[in-house]
């Protein structure tokens, strides 16, 4: 993905993630309400974020709320497979005030459109905790369909196991 590409939507824009976003993203990823929905369930340090950023900068975008002109989350296409024309989708909304407003669904539509139209992908898939109803609703709204349930696939910090859903959208 071209890191200079900016994608415009109705209420959001997707712009490249920069090193200047580090303090904000570290704050988001250190919030238990955010990292509790991710597969890495622990706060993140600035150094770990910089390592993550180096790995994700080519495929990640910062979600910007156009009304307030401020970042509210991040979205990615990762594990891009050029042979089989597929990629994994990932997102988190870091700002509490941005949740429940359809921003996640719009970001998903913008990113999947980009993946299909610009990258030539055929399939975009994701993994989500089966208990994350808000995210599942957002993904369905964006056109993702459930493909299966991975029972007790993830061991949580509290020692309990969680089911994970696999969802995808096709071109």
Q: Which residues make up each language-model segment?
A:
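Glycine-rich acetyl-CoA-binding "A-motif" of GNAT/NAT acetyltransferases
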Residues: 69-73, 134, 161
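Conserved catalytic-core motifs of GNAT/GCN5-like acyltransferases
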Residues: 125-128, 145-162
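A short, well-structured alpha-helix characteristic of acyl/acetyltransferase catalytic modules
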Residues: 1-50
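Conserved acetyl-CoA-binding loop-helix of GNAT-fold acetyltransferases
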Residues: 100-114, 136-141
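Short glycine/proline-centered loop/turn elements that form peptide/ligand docking sites
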Residues: 104, 108, 131-135, 152-157
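Acetyl-CoA-dependent GNAT
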Residues: 42-98, 170-171
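Conserved GNAT acetyl-CoA-binding A-motif
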Residues: 117-127
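Conserved active-site tyrosine of GNAT-family acetyltransferases
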Residues: 139, 144, 167
């Amino acid at each position: 993905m071209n890191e200079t590409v900016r994608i415009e939507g109705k209420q959001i824009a997707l712009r490249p993630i920069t090193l200047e976003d580090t303090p904000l993203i570290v704050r988001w990823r250190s919030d238990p309400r955010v990292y509790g929905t991710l597969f890495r369930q622990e706060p993140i340090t600035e150094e770990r974020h910089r390592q993550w950023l180096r790995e994700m900068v080519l495929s990640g975008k910062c979600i910007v709320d156009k009304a307030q002109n401020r970042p509210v989350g991040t979205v990615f296409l990762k594990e891009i497979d050029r042979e089989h024309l597929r990629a994994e989708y990932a997102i988190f909304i870091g700002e509490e005030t941005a949740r429940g407003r359809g921003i996640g669904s719009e970001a998903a539509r913008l990113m999947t459109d980009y993946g299909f139209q610009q990258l030539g992908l055929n399939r975009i898939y994701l993994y989500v905790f089966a208990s994350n109803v808000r995210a599942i609703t957002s993904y369905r709204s964006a056109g993702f369909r459930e493909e299966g349930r991975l029972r007790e696939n993830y061991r949580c910090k509290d020692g309990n196991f969680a089911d994970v859903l696999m969802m995808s959208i096709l071109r």
